Amino acid sequence: MGKKRTKGKSVPEKASSESTEPMCRHLRKGLEQGNLKKALVNVEWNICQDCKTDNKVKDKSEEEAEDPSVWLCLKCGHQGCGRDSQEQHALKHYTTPRSEPHYLVLSLDNWSVWCYKCDEEIKYCSSNRLGQVVDYVRKQAGRITSKPAEKNNGHIELENKKLEKESKNEQEREKSESMAKENIPLDSASQITVKGLSNLGNTCFFNAVMQNLSQTPVLRELLKEVKMSGTIVKIEPPDLALTEPLEVNLEPPGPLTLAMSQFLNEMQENKKRIVTPKELFSQVCKKATRFKGYQQQDSQELLRYLLDGMRAEEHQRVSKGILKAFGNSTEKLDEEVKNKVKDYEKKKAIPSFVDRIFGGELTSTIMCDDCRTVSLVHESFLDLSLPVLDDQSGKKNINDKNVKKTMEEEDKDSEEEKDDSYMKTRSDVPSGTSKHTQKKAKKQAKKQAKNQRRQQKIQERFLHFNEICTTNYTEDNDHEAETALPGEGEVDTEFNRGSQEELTQTELCANQKDVNGQEEMIESAADERKCPEHPEVKSVSTESDLGSLTSAPECPRDLNGAFLEERTSGELDITNGLKNLTLNAAVDPDEISIEILNDSHSPALKVYEVMNEDPETAFCTLANREAFSTDECSIQHCLYQFTRNEKLQDANKLLCEVCTRRQCNGPKANIKGERKHVYTNAKKQMLVSLAPPVLTLHLKRFQQAGFNLRKVNKHIKFPEILDLAPFCTLKCKNVAEESTRVLYSLYGVVEHSGTMRSGHYTAYAKERTASCHLSNLVLHGDIPQDCEMESTKGQWFHISDTHVQAVPITKVLNSQAYLLFYERIL
């Protein structure tokens, strides 16, 4: 009778009208209130029933340390450990064949309801049937406590405290013994603590990253500065006529930054062994809704969204402060004030705390084989995504295959293959396991091909317009312009005032994904003679299959002309730039220079410049790199592949602007004034030109094979001390003069174990004394010297959500690393 009464009940109309969320269709079959009331009499709460029976022979304190989340079946009242545990008894209970399925479970940690059949959370309110059942369970669990429950809970709490004390004392004893062996003084003020993190529902990918960020003490130091109220900063004026800097009063930081600061303080100061990062995770989900829904996600993508979100909040603070400094609201701004604000924002005198800690710079060097002109492209990064070659696939390196393509292939097929291989090799392939991620990969390939076609059409129109401008202007002023190319290795251009024929640019429009994995449409220019008041942010492709530079002569622009800016949405607004082009702007050659910007506003800034660089040293590094060309199973070899020297030839030839001008001015010049573009063979190499204080390396284990994703389980060796010098330019910044070493010490690892469909993220973190040299480098810009290398001793811990265990360094080095965190020591 009880069962019939329960099934006959319907959801009240009031509840259905109040709830805006769609109700689960398995609610009627998965909910049995009568069975629940019987099962919840004299029951031990928050303990897995199956683990309790299976673990009689196991050590009790060991199980207490793991503390898995417990889920209550709403059909029969069974309590089982969740998906984040090793046994997953709650999931096994659901998959057990029965006459009536047990779909619904209730979390005894956060009181959320989950449907295994729908594989999603069910929303409820207190007025409907599900909400009433949850309220009843919460009362029975002791939220509204009865006297016998108080006694029972008090007894359990006493036992837990005893076990906690014993395990804590044992850990401290082991820790002190290991420290005594290594002769490290225990200093509570400078020591970094290691704690467990509660799993909020398939959030191990989040916990593993947070464990490593919590072991970055310089991040906590900078966040303390950011949180200081009434912070006043000074920004140098962009106009040289103005001598006094602009004083900007910054607002309080954004919610994500505040949540991050609060989390780091809890990890350092909280006396509890386990921290629940609920507020920080909710702020991340607000910035990126893809992390909602308790599905397994990718750790590297989480790190990217987290750092980019905090950086965006910092830039917003500065922009609002500049507006307030001009005494204007954001609603009404005249054009003059808007231009001033933009000029100050482009000055970028205040790098965000994210860039100060994790920010580095890559320089792509391209040299024409004919005229030996060297051009440099600077690109900022927060982490490096390194390719992992799979021996089992039996495929050659995709980049090498693209370089060796011949002109005999059809253009359409060649472009499709280049786009496809580009996504496989150097882009950050989404590594989630959900169907959403796979669909996103398909859309990405289609979008890239579409953008490529659109860019070709825009480029053709732009070429046609500029050829008309150049031809008309050349007929009148051809006798006034003269260009001298004195010799190989350098470009020396002579100007006559008022002659603007030689003010040409090389335009590159390429649809690519940058080193940080963010797709963008990039306009790249090599303008040797541009105005310092309007330096343009430019970029060039970082892939060998995009090595064919496409150039166009451009009419000189007025000093007040609009910029063709790099758009984050990938759209190149070329119309506005063409409206402001003029033909008679006189420019003084002495005032023209190339300016290298350190932009922190875009995730991956790229600056293009033509250098009078010595071709013999343009591709040299701080240290020898050839020793890493053979060992394919090491992180050094991955860096070697990432920074290897490439040949741009055949279908990937370079459109050289210098060779094009030389041919136009030579005896074979076209009488009609038409420019015939010259494509030449070239060399290209990407190296680190700014060593970041904290180096983050991402091993691309999740790779795209067609429309599917696969994981490369190959073990990659990584050292405890990494020398980045073989992969740095000779003029690398943040490196002491005449130094041939750039040393980093490993302090954190994110490991992914399992397969694409069923895996788990864990972290290895190093408890150590905070580095003084790293703090001085980040806070004051003091470059570490050779004689000042610090000790790298410390204790390693393996953290799997709430479980923390001390491990030797050998276990860390044998792990299947997915993310590596290195801190600068020299």
UniProtKB/Swiss-Prot annotation:
Question: Acidic residues composition bias: which ranges?
Answer: 408-419
Show the GO cellular component annotation of the record.
cytoplasm; nucleus
Q: Where is this cross-link: Glycyl lysine isopeptide (Lys-Gly) (interchain with G-Cter in SUMO2)?
A: 139
SUPFAM superfamilies, per the entry = Cysteine proteinases (SSF54001), RING/U-box (SSF57850)
Residue spans with biased composition (Basic residues)?
436-456
Reactions performed catalytically: Thiol-dependent hydrolysis of ester, thioester, amide, peptide and isopeptide bonds formed by the C-terminal Gly of ubiquitin (a 76-residue protein attached to proteins as an intracellular targeting signal)
What residues sit in the active site? Answer: 204 (nucleophile), 760 (proton acceptor)
Q: Which residues bind Zn(2+) 2?
A: 48, 51, 81, 89
Keywords from the UniProt entry: Activator, Cell cycle, Cell division, Chromatin regulator, Hydrolase, Isopeptide bond, Metal-binding, Mitosis, Nucleus, Phosphoprotein, Protease, Thiol protease, Transcription, Transcription regulation, Ubl conjugation, Ubl conjugation pathway, Zinc, Zinc-finger
Query: Could you say which enzyme class this protein belongs to?
Result: hydrolase
InterPro entries registered for this protein in UniProt: Papain-like_cys_pep_sf (IPR038765), Peptidase_C19 (IPR050164), Peptidase_C19_UCH (IPR001394), UBP16 (IPR030849), USP_CS (IPR018200), USP_dom (IPR028889), Znf_RING/FYVE/PHD (IPR013083), Znf_UBP (IPR001607)
GO terms of biological process kind: cell division; DNA damage response; mitotic nuclear division; monoubiquitinated protein deubiquitination; positive regulation of DNA-templated transcription; positive regulation of ribosome biogenesis; positive regulation of transcription by RNA polymerase II; positive regulation of translational elongation
Q: Where is the composition biased (Polar residues)?
A: 539-551
GO molecular function terms here? cysteine-type deubiquitinase activity; cysteine-type endopeptidase activity; histone binding; histone H2A deubiquitinase activity; ribosomal small subunit binding; transcription coactivator activity; ubiquitin binding; zinc ion binding
Task: Give the record's family classification.
Answer: Belongs to the peptidase C19 family. USP16 subfamily.
Q: What is this protein called?
A: Ubiquitin carboxyl-terminal hydrolase 16
Species lineage? Eukaryota, Metazoa, Chordata, Craniata, Vertebrata
